[in-house]
């Protein structure tokens, strides 16, 4: 029953509906735009799923990088001498955040020109359809979502919600991380959907939202939809 419920809930999320992540007010899986986003070429395409710089970078524990900013700088530097197409996208909720992540990223892209900016409102469904080959995150929920479409995800921290499962890659150090990115197309990963559903259930359905607050919904609404 748990697997069936998780499958249903995950598929609802991937249809662009909000639900199990109550702190979000916008979905990353909205309508597909007719205008193409990814370049039409034969290069492998990598998506950098950016984190808000202030959004609890140490909440789960230490990662390969000290924070989300250092992670971004490393990835941008890696893109400078690369045979891949690189893209970066923020969550659509970023425009409602109170930090300057979007501003800082756009300023950095003036220097790192191999990375292309994708508007946050662009649907992940569109990127998947157009042919993203790899997604990068530190510990984000894209690690559950993209593998469902057989797209590999490489995390930049072993302290992530998917660590006990094999549908993500979990490098242990910087050298391994760099090597996995540069050679991701050689990696052979057999994704089992039931593992994805189990992980989704344990992360988003097993624990009640009101375990800390008497009403989590009221807290989120009080803060205008933001929790960080």
Spans of model-derived segments:
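Nucleotide-activated donor-binding/catalytic signature segment of Leloir-type glycosyltransferases, i.e.
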Residues: 102-119
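A donor-sugar binding/catalytic signature common to diverse glycosyltransferases
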Residues: 120-168
């Amino acid at each position: 029953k748990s697997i069936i419920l998780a499958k249903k809930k995950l598929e609802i999320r991937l249809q662009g509906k909000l639900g199990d992540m109550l702190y979000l007010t916008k979905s990353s899986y909205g309508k597909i735009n007719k205008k193409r986003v990814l370049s039409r070429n034969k290069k492998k395409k990598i998506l950098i799923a950016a984190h808000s710089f202030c959004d609890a970078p140490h909440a789960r524990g230490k990662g390969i990088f000290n924070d989300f900013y250092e992670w971004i700088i490393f990835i941008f530097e890696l893109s400078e001498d690369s045979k891949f197409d690189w893209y970066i996208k923020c969550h659509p909720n970023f425009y409602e955040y109170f930090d300057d992540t979007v501003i800082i990223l756009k300023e950095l892209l003036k220097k790192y020109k191999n990375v292309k900016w994708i508007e946050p409102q662009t649907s992940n469904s569109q990127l998947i359809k157009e042919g993203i080959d790899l997604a990068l995150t530190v510990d984000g929920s894209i690690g559950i979502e993209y593998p469902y479409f057989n797209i590999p995800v490489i995390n930049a921290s072993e302290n992530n919600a998917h660590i006990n499962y094999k549908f993500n890659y979990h490098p242990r150090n910087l050298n391994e991380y760099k090597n996995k990115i540069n050679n991701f197309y050689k990696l052979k990963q057999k994704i089992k959907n039931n593992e994805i559903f189990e992980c989704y259930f344990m992360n988003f359905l097993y624990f009640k939202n009101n375990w800390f607050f008497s009403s989590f919904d009221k807290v989120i609404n009080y803060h205008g939809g933001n929790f960080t």
